[in-house]
Amino acid sequence: MSLGQHESWAAQGSHKHIEMKHTFIIILTLLAFVTSSQALDNPKREFRGAWLHVIGQTQWQNKTTAQAKEYIVDQIDKLQRAGCNAVIFQVRPTADAVYKSDLEPWSAWLTGKRGKAPNPLWDPMEFAIQEAHKRGMEFHAWLNPYRVTSTAKEILPKSHISNMEPQRFFRYNGQILFDPAYQENRDFICEVVKDITHRYDVDAIHIDDYFYPYPAPGKAIPDDASYLRKGNGMNRNDWRRHNVDLLIEQLYNTIKKEKPWVRFGISPFGIWRNKRTDPRGSESTGLQNYDDLYADVLLWDQKGWVDYVVPQLYWSLDQAAAPSRKLVKWWNDNIHNTDLYIGQDVKRTMDSPDPKNHDRNELDTKVTLSRNLKNVGGNVWWHGYWVTGNYKGAADSLAKKYQSTIALPPVYKGPGKGPKAVKKIELEKSDEGSFLSWDAPANGREEKTDDAIRFVVYEFLPGEKLDINNSQAIVALTPFHRVRIANPEPGLSYAVTTLDRLNRESDPIFLYVK
């Protein structure tokens, strides 16, 4: 969702020091700008994501395949340099596909015309997954579940399912949407998710804040017919929430049946309910998930139907209708069974002066708030293009201070015992340079949750405590079995550990440079 929409709906409601340059061998070089004092407060584990959306981004349509690939590499490189460890990439904006699909047409946002394949043919999602994983980053496939069109100007072919079976859809405020009341629609959306989960090495399936449509003044949702057929005597608002609940539960079960380690994440609007509506609600006066979008995020948390939530707290710290300072604490206190990260708006954060110090922006306070709250495990930056474009120095601030160390993602819940340790660490020296290499534990033929998929390399200075809990000691997070060492001087020590698909870490194996 755009920042402008967030601001509008809130108002209406008053309503160590090492950088990685990734090729197939990771090169370790010194980062002179990182001081130990800046890195001290950076946790070893933290989710640091960024959304890269395709909808509304016409730059994709004007690029050749080679240029589009270069663009993806550039964007992911810049996110990694800013300290991010997860890419949330939009692959289904409007019942279409930014990947090869037999279920839905190619996205017009990619090629300029819905159904038109890129030429020469390539698969943007597969390419982005490979590039993220090369850099040790997670890839979350981001889908919008219900939206079919985003504007009234879009014309769908006569063969489109919304024209063939119009009763399964409704039009609202210039958009066409799947009617959440239909089991056929839930089945179809889950089939799309099953297909992605089965065919692609995604780390998560991610859906955003669009459930029932955001309310337009004076316009009622045109679902009278489906309510009469399927309401079963329920209150209409409860019935709408129930329809969304059914999809969330079915999506979670679909993903876990296909690949138990793939996570299901949701980034809802930043207000569940206001306190004046419900005593359990937040000190806010904006639009409400529960009442306006029919999305009961607290129920999903209670039922265990979601692995993580990222409430979109895109407002300034003390915004009147939706103060993010209070809302972040509310979410911390009310999400109990699900991992919680905070959606932060880069532009609003960098534009807004800190209320207690007008000589700086709100970035420091927002990061500090999230890190000081027990149940918050990280942040996700909206949008990633503002990070990669270094809006008002945002990327510099992240790279030099707030995300200056390499962070491992949090440990996730799931089956398995965790990964085995690596074996036989060696330091090789040749005309090409010095390399640290190791033998990885063998994975079986069948994919498992505790497969070894990434490796963490630690470097310790002479006399330094060999503590793998020290975030400053991490110098590489990589899927490869070999890294180049710039200056393996005598007295240095190295450790290598394994991460599995749930980011559980093996015991370290050490090497001492003599």
State what each model feature region is.
Residues 393-449, 503-514:
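Pro/Thr/Ser/Gly-rich low-complexity, intrinsically disordered linker/stalk tracts
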Residues 441-469:
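Solvent-exposed loop/turn segments flanking beta-strands in beta-repeat/beta-sandwich domains
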Residues 97-112, 147-173, 210-232, 276-287:
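Aromatic- and acidic-residue-enriched segments that line the glycan-binding/catalytic groove
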Residues 138-148, 206-209, 240-289, 339-347:
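Aromatic-lined carbohydrate-recognition surfaces of secreted/lumenal glycan-active proteins
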Residues 51-53, 57-66, 70, 141, ...:
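Active-site-adjacent "subsite" loops/lids of carbohydrate-active enzymes
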Residues 70-96:
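Catalytic domains of carbohydrate-active enzymes, especially glycoside hydrolases
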Residues 485-505:
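Beta-strand-rich modules
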Residues 294-320, 338-415:
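Substrate-binding cleft of secreted/luminal carbohydrate-active enzymes
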